[in-house]
């Protein structure tokens, strides 16, 4: 935390930035955040393709249509988050989180899965709606971790949002701590059937931006460290290890 606050102090000492520097920095962040957050989840667009798509609306080389639409939608979600974060008098709501999710996914779609016995099953991913099926993940230690059940999710999300709003007003936690703990608690719930990682990273930047901290990019090359931090937080059943998610 001391190093983060030191870097934040250095950032403040550079303010205000020249207009051209601010524009260039915002554009760089927009490209880096969109590219890395999507690439971490399997999006196949290169950084160059992402740049051409988001800055000029052009596509070069072979590109998956779903990945193109996903990248454009994520950029819309980023802008939506920044607008909402600027409205500092408005508390966080579940409605906003669900709207952000709907923006990312755009519409409902069907997923097909091949089962071990060779048969195929399918289910619908609902944009903007909490999960209706259990979800889990294989952790870095090789164990299966079950997220909150569909039945528990609405109450847990209500608790999370209420906790955040109260903690923000109380002011006992720094924005860095708020963002890290919110991220961790959100990921433990995994409220949606898809898009949870992208929403979590958008919400981290929502909290940082809301408190006038620079937004962050978790790069694909740091994915292993990112997952280890979450695993360490799970093992500790607390919030402190999650602070290692934040790098300014």
Language-model segments: which ranges?
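FIC/Doc superfamily catalytic core
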Residues: 1-194, 198-247
């Amino acid at each position: 935390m001391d190093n983060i606050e030191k870097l934040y102090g250095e950032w403040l000492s550079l303010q205000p930035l020249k207009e051209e520097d601010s524009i260039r920095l915002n554009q760089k962040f927009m490209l880096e955040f969109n590219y890395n957050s999507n690439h971490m989840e399997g999006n196949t667009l290169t950084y160059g393709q992402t740049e051409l798509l988001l800055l000029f609306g052009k596509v070069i080389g072979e590109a998956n249509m779903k990945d193109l639409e996903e990248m454009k939608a994520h950029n819309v979600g980023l802008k939506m988050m920044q607008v909402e974060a600027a409205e500092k008098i408005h508390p966080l709501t579940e409605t906003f989180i669900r709207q952000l999710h709907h923006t990312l996914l755009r519409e409902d779609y069907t997923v097909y899965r091949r089962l071990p016995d060779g048969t195929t099953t399918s289910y619908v991913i609902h944009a903007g709606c909490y999960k209706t099926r259990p979800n889990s993940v294989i952790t870095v230690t090789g164990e299966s971790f079950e997220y909150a059940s569909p039945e528990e999710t609405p109450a847990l999300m209500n608790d999370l949002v209420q906790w955040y709003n109260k903690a923000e007003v109380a002011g006992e936690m720094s924005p860095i701590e708020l963002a890290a703990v919110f991220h961790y608690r959100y990921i433990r719930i995994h409220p949606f059937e898809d898009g949870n990682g992208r929403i979590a990273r958008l919400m981290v930047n929502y909290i940082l931006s809301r408190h006038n901290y620079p937004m962050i990019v978790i790069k694909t090359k740091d994915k292993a460290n990112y997952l280890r931090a979450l695993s360490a937080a799970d093992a500790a059943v607390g919030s402190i290890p999650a602070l290692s998610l934040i790098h300014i």
